[in-house]
């Protein structure tokens, strides 16, 4: 049985050719100019179509190099939320030496006003955070805080260095990576009193009701949360690591600081002084003795301050010390502890 034939039905041409109306060449010599979005006859130059879509694959950027082969992307880099302006500036190619010089000159001429100061501050914040091994999230938070201050023209009359120091200190507390005022002072070369004044002013602005509390953040998710003061337990890990003390000493020193806080043995003393004196006592008790001078070099607390705080701990040693902390369980506590 033969299958039905469809030869009698009309057919349509599914292949449509675009031929130049002037030269009528077949096959046509068509050129797609993606840079202008036009379809042009390669023989006579007649434009046959416009607004064509570039279907070629787009390049992705894996390099920050300024060389000609460094960034093949044609759409530019992503906008930086920490900078002002639209950041849609025209740039000059740096293909050769002359182009590189022109690119630098053009970049300086079109730079958004005030952006240079922000970039300088961000560079300093990044370098300072790297110097004391702070994670990137702390540096980003400090930069965001600095931008909020700059946008609202807050803290007028204060030096940029003192503002940077205060921003890093607040960022450390927000990120649960505490650093002392003395460490920030040594890092930034800003007097401790100046950092303290700027920090208190900035903290008031960031808390509820302050000038910066309801401002729109440059980085979403970085809301300011007022934190409590740094405790001695928070400082133990870093100080003990720098003194090459084992984990057992860290845990015992942190517990000693907690007990001293509950009993009020060192009431009124700074957390760093409590941490230093606790390390001095526990390191000797557990067989890893450190001198006040060694502890002073790490913590920044003077020898005399460590000895005075230790004297108060020594007076209540029986209530504060757990017998299992003694290196030689059968040993005498008083024989192992240094005399106050």
UniProtKB/Swiss-Prot annotation:
SUPFAM superfamilies with a match to the protein in the record: Cyclin-like, Zinc beta-ribbon
InterPro entries for the chain: Cyclin-like_dom, Cyclin-like_sf, TFIIB, TFIIB_CS, TFIIB_cyclin, Znf_TFIIB
Residues that hold Zn(2+) according to the record: 20, 23, 41, 44
Presence of keyword Ligase: no
Cellular compartment(s): Nucleus
UniProt-listed Pfam families: TFIIB, Zn_Ribbon_TF
A single cellular component GO annotation: nucleus
Sequence repeat coordinates: 128-204, 239-315
CDD domains: CYCLIN_TFIIB_rpt1 (cd20551), CYCLIN_TFIIB_rpt2 (cd20552)
UniProt-recorded Gene Ontology molecular function terms: RNA polymerase II general transcription initiation factor activity; TBP-class protein binding; zinc ion binding
Zinc finger (TFIIB-type): 16-49
Keyword Cell membrane recorded: no
Alphabetic keyword roster: Metal-binding, Nucleus, Repeat, Transcription, Transcription regulation, Zinc, Zinc-finger
Biological process, per Gene Ontology: DNA-templated transcription initiation; RNA polymerase II preinitiation complex assembly; transcription initiation at RNA polymerase II promoter; transcriptional start site selection at RNA polymerase II promoter
UniProt similarity note: Belongs to the TFIIB family.
Primary role: General factor that plays a major role in the activation of eukaryotic genes transcribed by RNA polymerase II.
Oligomeric and partner information: Associates with TFIID-IIA (DA complex) to form TFIID-IIA-IIB (DAB-complex) which is then recognized by polymerase II.
Protein name as catalogued: Transcription initiation factor IIB
Natural source organism: Schizosaccharomyces pombe (strain 972 / ATCC 24843) (Fission yeast)
Lineage: Eukaryota, Fungi, Dikarya, Ascomycota, Taphrinomycotina
Encoding gene per record: sua7
């Amino acid at each position: 049985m033969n299958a039905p034939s469809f030869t009698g039905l009309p057919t349509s041409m599914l292949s449509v050719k675009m031929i130049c109306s002037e030269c009528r060449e077949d096959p046509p010599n068509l050129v797609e100019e993606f840079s202008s979005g036009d379809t042009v006859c390669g023989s006579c130059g007649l434009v046959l179509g416009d607004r064509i879509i570039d279907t070629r694959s787009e390049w992705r950027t894996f390099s920050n190099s300024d060389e000609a082969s460094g960034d093949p992307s044609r759409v530019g880099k992503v906008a930086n939320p920490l900078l002002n302006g639209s950041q849609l500036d025209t740039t000059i190619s740096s293909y050769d030496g002359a182009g590189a010089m022109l690119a630098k000159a053009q970049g300086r001429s079109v730079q958004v006003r005030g952006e240079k100061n922000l970039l300088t501050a961000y560079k300093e914040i990044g370098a300072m955070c790297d110097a004391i091994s702070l994670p990137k999230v702390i540096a980003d938070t400090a930069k965001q805080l600095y931008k909020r201050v700059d946008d609202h023209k807050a803290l007028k009359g204060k030096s940029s260095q003192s503002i940077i120091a205060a921003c890093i200190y607040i960022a450390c507390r927000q990120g649960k990576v505490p650093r002392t005022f003395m460490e920030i002072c040594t890092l930034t070369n800003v007097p401790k009193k100046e950092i303290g004044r700027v920090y208190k002013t900035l903290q008031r602005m960031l808390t509820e009701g302050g000038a910066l509390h309801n401002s729109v953040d440059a980085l979403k998710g970085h809301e300011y949360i007022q934190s409590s003061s740094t405790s001695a337990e928070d400082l133990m890990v870093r100080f003990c690591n720098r003194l090459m003390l084992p984990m057992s000493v860290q845990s015992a020193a942190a517990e000693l600081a907690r007990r001293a806080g509950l009993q009020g043995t060192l009431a009124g003393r700074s957390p760093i002084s409590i941490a230093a004196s606790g390390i001095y006592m526990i390191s000797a008790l557990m067989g890893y003795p450190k001198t006040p001078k060694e502890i002073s070099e790490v913590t920044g607390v003077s020898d005399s301050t460590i000895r005075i705080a230790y004297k108060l701990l020594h007076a209540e040693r029986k209530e504060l010390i757990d017998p299992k902390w003694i290196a030689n369980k059968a040993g005498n506590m008083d024989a192992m502890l240094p005399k106050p």
